[in-house]
A protein has these predicted regions:
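Cytosolic beta-strand hydrophobic patch enriched in CBS
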Residues: 57-61, 194-200, 256
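Glycine/small-residue-rich hydrophobic helix-like segments
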Residues: 183-244
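Hydrophobic beta-strand segments of well-ordered beta-sheets in folded domains
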Residues: 3, 79-83, 108-115, 218, ...
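Conserved donor-binding loop and adjoining core beta-sheet/short helix segment
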Residues: 28-94, 98, 203-230
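Generic helix N-cap/helix-start motif at coil->alpha-helix transitions
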Residues: 80, 182-183
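Alpha-helical elements of Rossmann-like donor-binding domains used by nucleotide-donor carbohydrate transfer enzymes
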Residues: 12-16, 98, 102, 167, ...
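Short amphipathic alpha-helix that is part of the acyltransferase structural core
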Residues: 1-41, 138, 148-180
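Acyl-donor-binding surface of acyltransferase catalytic domains
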Residues: 88-153, 238, 247, 253-286
Length: 286
């Protein structure tokens, strides 16, 4: 049975939720098995969901025993839901079935995204058994900037500003597809991003970095080329420009997801990125 987690029950449930979050076979994304995020981070993030009007925390019980916790965000205006804690000890399929039914009743017609480690076979099997498509399979790479020493400045890479945003937009419109963060949304939230471009025409490339204030963990949201073809040296240049900027701003960790089997692996490995594991994303139409 799923029910809203009450504040008085938080301490009783959070220990189990964190224990499960440290097991990729019993948890979802974002993963806490990466050696970066801490128990304190997990507790703080989950507690924050209890206080936010656009987030909920549910507890999954069977026969009066707590078996898991699900926390998620629901963006009402966008009709979009996103799970950020999925810690289930057993009967994962039943928990997901109840969760999807709960969301479908409250937000019919919305989209629900669920991210999972490849190891969480129970969750993946239930979703796939319901015909839910896997929309992304990526390697989760992590870079520790604490020992990073920037080399010489990178030539040919240009930061994006309001003045040259259309250069960036000309690239991003060709690669954005159905992604939420399209040109229009990025432009409206320029303060939340760091953008770089390189090259021109079909060979032009872009890198999009999160820029959430003083957060010591940032993420590369996208790095690609206008014609969709991978080019190792421009890729390395864009990535290096991103690392230089993040080091300057005091960032400690950088996350970068790349397609499983993609050619980026060689450059990432040589630059010192560490592969945390495989990420799989599923999208449920409610």
């Amino acid at each position: 049975m799923l029910k809203i987690l009450q504040a008085a029950e938080f301490d009783r449930c959070i220990e189990l939720a964190y224990e499960l979050a440290m097991d990729p076979a019993r948890s979802g994304y974002p993963t806490y098995c990466d050696g970066m995020k801490t128990k304190g981070d997990f507790v703080e993030r989950t507690r924050a969901s209890m206080e936010r009007s656009d987030e909920d925390v549910l507890v999954f019980e069977e026969n009066g025993t707590v078996e898991g916790v699900i926390a998620f965000q629901h963006q009402e205006g966008e009709r979009y839901l996103h799970v950020h804690c999925l810690s289930i000890r057993k009967d994962t399929g039943r928990a997901l079935e109840e969760f999807v039914a709960y969301c479908r009743e409250r937000w019919p017609g919305a989209m629900l995204d669920v991210g999972l480690p490849a190891e969480n076979v129970d969750a993946r099997s239930w979703l796939e058994g319901q015909g839910v498509p896997c929309i992304e399979r990526s390697w989760n790479y992590l870079f520790d900037l604490s020992g990073y020493q920037p080399a010489a400045e990178v030539s040919g890479v240009r930061p994006v500003t309001e003045e040259n945003f259309e250069e960036f937009a000309a690239i991003h419109r060709r690669v954005q597809g159905e992604m939420y963060w399209n040109c229009e949304r990025i432009r409206k939230a320029m303060a939340d991003w760091h953008l770089f471009i390189t090259g021109t025409g079909d060979e032009a490339g872009e890198v999009i970095l999160t820029g959430f204030g003083s957060n010591e963990h940032q993420e590369i949201f996208a790095l690609g080329f206008a014609d969709g073809k991978y080019r190792a040296e421009p890729f390395r240049a864009l990535l290096t420009a991103a690392l230089h900027l993040l080091k300057e701003k005091g960032t400690r960790w950088l996350t970068f997801f790349v397609d499983v089997g993609g050619p980026e692996k060689e450059v990432l490995d040589k630059m010192g990125f560490r592969c945390v594991g495989e990420f799989q994303a599923y999208r449920v139409k409610l």
